[in-house]
Amino acid sequence: MINITIPTPDVTITKKVNPQESNIYGFTEFHLITRELGGIFMFYNDKDELLYVGKARKLRPRIKKHFEDAVSPIRMHRDEVTKIEVCIVEDPVHREIYETYIINEGKAKYNEDKVFFKQA
């Protein structure tokens, strides 16, 4: 049995109650997410259910793209995202392992790739 410890998030940002404070689906603190470093990110809803897990070589641009892109797997569910957690993981192999592991252990609702559990 492989034992993987999920990293503690380096940054957590939450949707603001007053959406006019932000032009990106209620999130105002994207500046707290590194622009230059790689890692993994998790999107959660207001019940703290895992919605989506992703990885990136440059975190902030990739996360923002999910809220702007017409082909993002969460494009129809952006309003559900109330919390974003970010873990800095510079090694690309480690990012790949963590992403796949978290998708399956957390049963991420909107991930389509790397899914090895049966969706309900």
Label each PLM-derived region with a short phrase:
Residues 1-57, 96-97:
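GIY-YIG nuclease catalytic motif and its immediate N-terminal context
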Residues 36-38, 60-68, 82-120:
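Structure-specific nucleic-acid interaction/processing domains
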Residues 69-76:
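Cytochrome P450 catalytic domain signature, combining two hallmark sequence patches
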